[in-house]
Amino acid sequence: MSEALSVPAAEGENTVTASESPDLAATSARAEKVGKQEKPEKAEKQSPMMLQYHRIKADHPDTLLFYRMGDFYELFHDDAEKAARLLDITLTARGQSGGVPIRMAGIPFHSADQYLARLVKLGESVAICEQIGDPATSKGPVERKVVRIVTPGTLTDAALLPDKSDTFLLAVHQQTTRRGVSKTGLAWLNLASGELRLMECDAAQLSRELERIRPAEVLYTDGMDLPTLTCARTRLPEWHFDQEAGTRRLREQIGVASLEPFGCSGLGAALGAAGALLNYAATTQGQSLRHVQGVTVERESEFVGLDSATRRNLELTETLRGTESPTLFSLLDTCATTMGSRALRHWLHHPLRDPALPRARQQAIGALITQGPDGLRAVLRKLADVERITARLALLSARPRDLSSLRDTLRALPDVQAATVSSEDAPLLAQTLEEIDIPQDCLELLIRAVADEPSTVIRDGGVIARGYDSELDELRDISENCGQFLIDLETRERERTGITNLRVEYNRVHGFYIEVTNGQADKVPDDYRRRQTLKNAERYITPELKAFEDKALSAQDRALAREKQLYDGLLQALLPHIGSLRRVAGALARLDVLATLAERAKTLDWVQPERVQENVIDISQGRHPVVEGQLAAESVAFIANDCQLNEARKLLLITGPNMGGKSTFMRQTALIVLLACVGAWVPARRAVIGPVDRIFTRIGAADDLAGGRSTFMVEMTEAAAILHNATPSSLVLMDEIGRGTSTFDGLALAWAIARHLLSHNRSHTLFATHYFELTQLPVEFPQAANVHLSAVEHGDGIVFLHAVQDGPASQSYGLQVAQLAGVPQPVIRAARKHLAWLEEQSADATPTPQMDLFSAQSSPSADDEDDKSAGQSAVPPAQAATLEALADIDPDSLSPREALEALYRLKSISETARTV
């Protein structure tokens, strides 16, 4: 029975009904008048279908509801208005209900993914409501239910996910222990891979951890204040985060009696967060999370600490301008697979303190360089994204081409093994190859079951291979042999009737028919029954053709139904292989990253760093990898530099001109240290790196308008974080600290901060400054040393040598840099004149008291300075005014009109002088 949709009629109109069949979905069903989203006072005015809609929508009030009607997803009322605005689709209003216009909008089912992707990117969540009943047998509305909820943190479809970055759903919960200590528990899940991680930290560290993990969606409790986030946020009741329930839920998910082997002992708030996370994820997917088969507990002491400022300033995966290139990741990412690209991104954001694993990675890279990584990388390029396909298998949402891609990838694994030689000197490489263990049963099943080139979706058929199921083969034979039957029937009927132009054909609307032109109508036999009349012909059906039609069309429908049944069974049969497929995916991703880093090291002339226990950073001929790459594109050589930091040389005071390369030198040192801790080779001739626990950067600054903080406040906040947290094993980069306030305040702060870093933190520090007074610091602290970026003057210009040399710089060359930047010549000349006056005042005048940091202070006006200059000069005032006016004139840049105006000004000055 077809499903009818009826609505209250607007005044003066009749109630409209329409069949909700796929054939009418794009016409009648899309134009139906529907009731208000709020449940109407008089339920009898609503159709059964709209009552069904309101009931389902009531369970999902905060999400957009995609309500399946034939070949469309419909949105009604407020959802329709919101979707129309966000997606730029048509919003219709047809009729009224209770005086309110009835709004609706829709999107085609076959293109839903692109609309979902746009909504998720905007932070919206969408409930997908599908028809699960059969319209042909339903009495009343077709049965529907929400089969999944798409949220920013629970994406698994390939069309919705970024290829080269992970999407995390994170739950955070704060808990106070019996001793009154507040702990913050984090649990985050990559639903597209099944990777689950837990961590506990102090509340003060929450912002840093969120910056590291960068979740797409955060679950949190009522009343909890979250740091400023750009991701989606979902508030859940407190009881969702119950620790005991969370522990139970996690044990059930992993299938173990105890969580101790996973390192969960002592965790509290994180277990509550894990319970909320798993329940939320399972609810959105509408089923269990079979691919989440383990948990990893992270400790703060495991990774080299990188706060948000450091990640931003080092431009690991995003530039300061917010673009993806040029960054360290964009330079390194030549990965053959998207799995490898995601793993590489993770490695760069998670450098390790313990040198054991980085050293093992570097050994594997060395072995691959010796073997030559090109052959392996060529094989890896043929592989599919096994990690995400496995997740979709576990969620029973894999599509036919996922299965064919998985089959082809498993077939190629022997080639991967053959292209890589295990080495005793590279145990990690040997371990990785062992983990690429081909699941033969899984491969054989896929070979038998899946067609060589299956259709995109199961409803189109052609997915299950021939020979896999005899019943399906028989049904296919019936429907596929129609052509030959029609040819044979047409031949027989022409001979029987004598109608030479008789045709036997088929179309979707009228089925099978025999067509006879009007001129041959007198020859039509009595057993022909008219099916359709055309202008110049008649179409007929015979008992034989009708019997075949029933059989053929029935066979096609039954074949599609059988194929869907077999496909569902195939997905179930593949579930036991989820664990082995996840291990293979992890090993392939790791191998791809190692091969990529080997190729990069070989191509870019990088070296394997030496990791030692001594607290030292000793880099010979180090280079900034990204800047070097940019210069190479312009055929310009990068100037390499050395950097030595040790117990006797803890702080380098770096002076030199703007644009001389101070910031580049500092950043390249940090990047070399980070790459060594990641396990990559490094851009240097030689690098010896000791223990590193954190990397801090205080480089550049900008107003925090949203937070109400000035540039100087941002600068001091970051400096305070460094002074409170840096240790002797930390690397600190300080660039022009104190520049955001008055000269003496800034100098005093810079001096005190440098002294504190030397005397208290004792960190490895690169301290760039334009305060030349700081170059006297090594007199008080022998652990400090002066270096400078050299430059030479050439005429009125300057040539930057970009070479780091011992000792302080002689000057900053600020005016020369301003000239290079295109500052007008009159301004440059005025600046030179004023600089000379300032230097004279500095040498001769008594010092003026320095005002307090927050006090207003004024500097002499230009007029005052000119008066002072004139007063100290023997030149008469009138002559001085003439000379100054002449100095401001650039004859080569004047137009004729400007030259004439300048001449009039000089004449005016002369006349004024005579009058005086």
UniProtKB/Swiss-Prot annotation:
Task: Specify which residues bind ATP according to the UniProt entry for this protein.
Answer: 656-663
InterPro entries to which the protein is assigned, alphabetical = DNA_mismatch_repair_MutS (IPR005748), DNA_mismatch_repair_MutS-lik_N (IPR007695), DNA_mismatch_repair_MutS/MSH (IPR017261), DNA_mismatch_repair_MutS_C (IPR000432), DNA_mismatch_repair_MutS_clamp (IPR007861), DNA_mismatch_repair_MutS_core (IPR007696), DNA_mismatch_repair_MutS_N (IPR016151), DNA_mismatch_repair_MutS_sf (IPR036187)
SMART domains registered for this protein in UniProt: MUTSac, MUTSd
Cross-referenced Pfam families: MutS_I, MutS_II, MutS_III, MutS_IV, MutS_V
Keywords, comma-separated and alphabetical: ATP-binding, DNA damage, DNA repair, DNA-binding, Nucleotide-binding
The lineage's top-level taxon is Bacteria
Q: Which CDD domains match?
A: ABC_MutS1 (cd03284)
- Compositional bias (Basic and acidic residues): 30-45
Q: Name the PROSITE patterns for this protein.
A: DNA_MISMATCH_REPAIR_2
What GO molecular-function term can you cite, just one?
damaged DNA binding
Q: Please list the GO biological process terms of this entry.
A: mismatch repair
What task does this protein carry out? This protein is involved in the repair of mismatches in DNA. It is possible that it carries out the mismatch recognition step. This protein has a weak ATPase activity.
**Family indicated by similarity:** Belongs to the DNA mismatch repair MutS family.
Q: Which named protein is this?
A: DNA mismatch repair protein MutS
Ranked from the top, the taxonomy reads: Bacteria, Pseudomonadati, Pseudomonadota, Betaproteobacteria, Burkholderiales
